Amino acid sequence: MGKLFGTDGVRGVFNEELTVELAYQLGRFGSHVLSEGSHNPKIVIGKDTRISGDPLEKALTEGIVSVGGDVILAGVIPTPAVAVIARELGADAGIVISASHNPYQFNGIKFFSGDGYKLSDDVENHIESFILEKKEVESHPTGTVTVLEHPEKIYLGHITKDFDCDFSGLKMVLDCAHGASYSIAPEFFVNGGAEVVTIGNKPDGKNINAGCGSTCLNVLCDAVVKEQADIGIAFDGDADRCLVVDEKGEIVDGDKLLHLIGVKMKKEGRLKKDTVVVTVMSNIGLDIALEKADCKTIKTAVGDRYVLEEMLNNGYNLGGEQSGHVILLDHNTTGDGMLTALVFLTLLKEDGRLASELSALMTSYPQVLVNAKVSNDKKKAYLSDEVIQLKISEVEKHFDGQGRVLIRPSGTEPLVRVMIEG
């Protein structure tokens, strides 16, 4: 990671760490780097529902057209849709304006390459060097700006091509986090024949992720029970992650989704190398459940970009995180909340059992996770702190091999996450 780019693009509080001036520079120099300065780049821009999305979109666009780039505006749309659209339209890049699950005060700018993958550290560092070293590029004739009509059709056409999308007989509650999926998701599932109750679908620019969505499931859990629904589906602000609530109002997290999807793919002969790629934060119960199905796990550092790197480098096609980032490389190049929901609902209908019965096929070990606020410059101080290291050793000795302590700095926020599992 550099000084500007974190684990998921450039992110910060709008008008503090992330300004319109920085957005202009990212648009200008990002376009230059991604087109290698050899042609007029074509770049797709999408965003979520944050109030700061419009000024950042305007600044990015101005930066891109200033080096002769042509901008295609996809409007409010899920992050994974931008990856699909960029690829389908033959663009040089896609840019998403979103801070994912963070509050509305934050925003972010994330690049996808023309083939729909997040940029490598080397490419991000190259873009960053232009900004930090105040480099310049040659002037070009001004590029063009086009508003893309019905971008959702391109996205949905791609992720649904291998599924029949018949949700008839299912009653579901959708929580769209007042974010990017607020319109596209309810319409999609209704068109598939489901009875849909939707919450979190009235964005006002400031309520994204506020007491709703995949990071705050209480309202959805209650709604599923109250509505006597078969299932609840929660997305985060940019809909690149998905979590599920069963008919009893209990959470089915990303680990359990990976278990169910992985076992199904294994039975169908589609799970490459019989392996699911997860992170060090995944529950021990996932390892045990997958082992019973003759599947293996490979663990990476926390962050879907590291999961994806492992998948691409070693030929795996399923991976993800407990938080609900699920990467299904047979269908998309990045974590995709709506795709994950589609795959799980297809599994649910084909299996015939209740969601709670499927969830019970994996037993999760108890985990306690605490977020400690720590300034960015001190997030790794625990590594050399003798008192902290001694306490970790004492706790793990007490578990006698049946538990662990994991401390990791957040890649997107001034936090250190402390997890105890056993």
Annotate the PLM regions.
Residues 32, 36-107, 187-245:
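N-terminal small/polar loop signature for handling phosphorylated ligands or for N-terminal nucleophile
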Residues 13, 107-227:
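Gly/Ser/Thr-enriched, mixed-charge loops and adjacent short helices
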Residues 1-62, 66-68, 145-170, 379-380, ...:
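An N-terminal, well-structured beta->alpha segment
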Residues 39-48, 72, 171-173, 275-280, ...:
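Short glycine-rich phosphate-binding loop at a beta-alpha junction
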Residues 8, 45, 82, 95, ...:
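Buried hydrophobic positions in well-ordered alpha/beta secondary-structure cores of metabolic enzymes
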Residues 231, 268-422:
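Phosphate-binding and adjacent anionic-ligand microenvironments
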Residues 71-80, 251-254, 278-279, 300-301:
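Active-site nucleophile and cofactor-binding loops and adjacent substrate-binding regions
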